[in-house]
Amino acid sequence: MRYSKPPLNIPDQLQQLRDRGLLVRSDDLALNALELIGYYRLSAYWLFFEEPPAPGETRSHRFKPGSSFEQVIELYNRDRLIRLLVIDAIERIEIAARSAWVQEMSMKHGPHCYLDPLLFRSDFNHGEQLEQLRSQLQQSNETFVIHYRQTYSEPELPPIWAMTELISLGTLRAWIAATELDSKTKVARSLGMPSAQVLNGVLHSLNLLRNISAHHGRLWNRLIVKRLPKIKKLQNLLVLEDVDGEGVQPSKMLYNYLVLMAIIVRKVAPLSTWPSRMGVVMSEMGPEQQGAMGCPVGWQQQQIWS
């Protein structure tokens, strides 16, 4: 079937929402939001307020009685707050993982240890990784990069503690995963994770969340592509589900990832108020909106949110 829906101007977009039963108390607010946020982006949030579709349909395009544009904007803003808090937590976790890996590797193998391919798995493509670092260095105007170039003739690349300031979370995860077991296990335990394998899965999941958040994507009411690894000591805190062929696994709904972030943040930044701030944002949502994130009944009583 060929797509044939015509574009609508903003006043017509608002009228279409009214025709479908959405209450609009302030035309100015609604028109401004449609102009600055966009009809399509907001539609992911007002879908929650629509009547269930009839059999054979994907959407009803009719709003539940009492649903308002203001409720849609409130939900949109809650998701934005969650996204900002997620970026905050991942920043802390990424920096802690980076610092732990740098300290472990440099103390054991020296400041330029990452240049030695023998310290990493044979399937890591070490040479390709170094080429990517060289390319980043050539394009960088960071003060520490310029200083190293102007001051030292060799090695060509800066020490590990400088190099890691240039790499992404995804690249950091790859380097840690390629490290020998004893060292990466110590990194995992510094973040409160039981094993290097679990840490790798956690960093993979958090990297996906970081990318969604950095591109301003919706987190609320979304299934995260990468399922969290099973972490035995957290099973009473996570929401679990039966997965065909895999047994009981953590749900892919957002709540589980927020639980994990709260636990790691408590480990790497004990004085942080992040868990309680996230708990406040979630508690200000209605029960159905919390359920759409995967929040279990009674989640507020969990000590991690206090």
Where are these regions (language model features)?
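Extended intrinsically disordered or low-complexity regions, especially N/C-terminal cytosolic tails and loops
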Residues: 1-208, 220-306
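Acidic/aromatic/glycine-rich contiguous surface patches that form carbohydrate-binding/processing clefts
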Residues: 216
